[in-house]
């Protein structure tokens, strides 16, 4: 599981026979998540990412609470979604860039939310009853360029998106990709031959030099 350490990655590699002497290529074919913490990352983007990038992403995702994960899931499905793994990582630094309404999934629900639940529209109730909720929600989404997704409605808040990672190197503490050194069994280790020094060539013991106080 990630985030992981270099030692944990090496242990996993060695379990399938991958070492520095046998550096086989391996590929990422998806990911898994916890049942109580579903994360809807773009499959192709995950498979194309580097191990170090995914390790850093996993560490950053630990900073998101349930509402943050829900907003991320919606953001991955919006019209102009994330283009690379760096933008996914940067989302964790830019949670306030989006407004996420998880209970809204279509124009009618958006119209009802804005008209009756948000407190943004002040008018007599009888006037509200005459408004077409579908048309109202559709117009609102078009004007603010919002997106209806499986995980709710998402619209930009107006805050500026700040690049923290995209285009930069993974921080050193999250770089784990390397091949482990092969394990040498003691029985397989070559015998070390000890050279025999002729008695004539053996050094005589050094004389003891007394210390005068």
Outline where the language-model segments fall:
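Non-Sec secretion/translocation targeting segments of pathogen effectors
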Residues: 132, 182-213
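Mixed-charge (acidic/basic) macromolecular-recognition segments
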Residues: 12-129, 156-183
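Short, extreme N-terminal segment that most often corresponds to the first beta-strand
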Residues: 1-6, 210-213
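Ordered hydrophobic segments in well-structured contexts
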Residues: 1, 25-29, 145-156
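A generic structural signal for short, solvent-exposed coil/turn residues
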Residues: 20-22, 146, 203
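Acidic, low-complexity, intrinsically disordered interaction modules
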Residues: 117, 123-135, 143-145, 149
């Amino acid at each position: 599981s990630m985030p992981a350490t270099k030692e944990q990655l090496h242990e996993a590699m060695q379990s399938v026979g991958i070492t520095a002497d046998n550096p086989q290529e391996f590929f990422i074919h998806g990911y898994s998540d916890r049942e109580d913490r579903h994360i809807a990352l773009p499959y192709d983007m995950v498979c194309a990412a580097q191990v170090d990038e995914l390790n850093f992403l996993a560490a950053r995702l630990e900073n998101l609470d349930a509402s943050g994960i829900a907003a991320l899931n919606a953001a991955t499905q919006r019209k102009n979604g994330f283009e690379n793994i760096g933008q996914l990582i940067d989302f964790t630094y830019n949670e306030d860039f989006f407004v996420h309404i998880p209970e809204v999934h279509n124009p009618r629900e958006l119209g009802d939310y804005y008209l009756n639940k948000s407190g943004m529209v002040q008018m007599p109730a009888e006037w509200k009853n005459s408004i077409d909720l579908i048309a109202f929600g559709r117009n609102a989404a078009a004007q603010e360029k919002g997106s209806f997704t499986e995980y709710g409605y998402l619209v930009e808040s107006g805050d500026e998106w700040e690049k923290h990672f995209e285009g930069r190197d993974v921080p050193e503490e999250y770089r784990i990709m390397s091949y482990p050194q092969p394990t040498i069994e003691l029985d397989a280790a070559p015998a070390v031959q000890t050279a025999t020094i002729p008695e004539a060539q053996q050094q005589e013991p050094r004389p003891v030099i007394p210390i005068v106080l």
